[in-house]
Amino acid sequence: MKTNSDLYQVTTHAPGPAGQLPLDADFLRNAPSGDVFGLTQDAGMGWPAGQLRRKEFLILSTLGGLRAPDGRPIALGYHVGHWEVGLLAQAAAEEFARQGAIPFAGFVTDPCDGRTQGTPGMMDSLAYRNDAAIVLRRLIRSLPTRRGVLGVATCDKGLPAMMMALAAQRTLPCVVVPGGVTLLPTQGEDAGKIQSVGARFAHGLISLEEASEWGCRACASPGGG
């Protein structure tokens, strides 16, 4: 077996971001240590050090999958509903930054009960709502410097979870952004009816060709239910 000596040249240090954190004596002396270290983290992720300590806003979404900038799927999500909500979150983040604020983003993806239908995964669909709402609330509290929260979510699991999480924020301004809907196919069946193709084929109500074609085009665009 051949070895490459470069494998053993492990990088352990780097120069780090240039600049200085916008600290003052009062902040450094009295702020929670997490607020100070948070600035170090922010600079480490590439935000210009001189622009830190501005108003911070948290964007939460149910984004799933990995979508290339040209729309090509790198890794699929659980359903088309959360496939492009990242674009909405990105637009919101860019607007926050344009207004002089600092956007943060966090994600709690959601399942699809259509995908789990007829499997043990159905046991997790409704339970997901409460579980995800708890996680979303924990993410909100885990950014202590946030001034408000914007939630982007779709479908009948992710959107209720987001709404429950934001409704619990009694001292923060919050906005819910529905992620849009899936367009209907010009010809064929919608994403609800198409889920019964197996049963209808078994009863001779549709042909194999119809099931194959309609099933391919039923989700005519990304979007949620």
Residues covered by each model-derived region:
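Metallocofactor- and cofactor-centric catalytic cores in central/energy metabolism, strongly enriched
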Residues: 1-225
